[in-house]
Amino acid sequence: MDNKTYEISSAEWEFMNIIWMKKYASANNIIEEIQMQKDWSPKTIRTLITRLYKKGFIDRKKDNKIFQYYSLVEESDIKYKTSKNFINKVYKGGFNSLVLNFVEKEDLSQDEIEELRNILNKK
């Protein structure tokens, strides 16, 4: 899967978080889970499932006449590649610019500053 296909919508993130948490889930399980958080129709959720299936993020297997959906991508991989795409798009690939933007605009606690220092020192 190339980097461009790693762009997913907020709604698709909702779905993927459920799949990563449950490992396997039927469409009805997914619908129930999403409807506890969002006011989406079952048809909308089924469309979302189909879209992610066609994009190659999920696959399905038949279990007693019911499709069980599961992720084809690791959560950490998609988060990394999505973040990388964002940095390339918004910051022209400059990770330094991203960090500087947040450090300058956010009020960081001493603990957060120390944590950043420790991370950088390990590199």
Curated annotation (Swiss-Prot):
PTMs per UniProt: Upon exposure to beta-lactams, proteolytic cleavage at a single site impairs dimerization and abolishes repressor activity.
A molecular function (GO) term: DNA binding
Residue intervals passing through the bilayer: none
Protein location: Cytoplasm
Residues covered by region (Important for dimerization): 74-123
Site feature (Cleavage) residues: 101-102
Keyword terms, alphabetized: Antibiotic resistance, Cytoplasm, DNA-binding, Repressor, Transcription, Transcription regulation
Superkingdom of source: Bacteria
Gene Ontology BP, a term: response to antibiotic
GO CC terms of this entry: cytoplasm
Gene3D superfamilies from the UniProt entry: Penicillinase repressor domain (1.10.4040.10), Winged helix-like DNA-binding domain superfamily/Winged helix DNA-binding domain (1.10.10.10)
Pfam families documented for this protein: Penicillinase_R
Reported function: Transcriptional repressor that constitutively blocks the transcription of the gene for the penicillin-binding protein MecA. Binds DNA as a dimer.
Subunit structure: Monomer and homodimer.
Entry similarity comment: Belongs to the BlaI transcriptional regulatory family.
Name the UniProt record assigns to this protein: Methicillin resistance regulatory protein MecI
Highest classification ranks of the organism: Bacteria, Bacillati, Bacillota, Bacilli, Bacillales
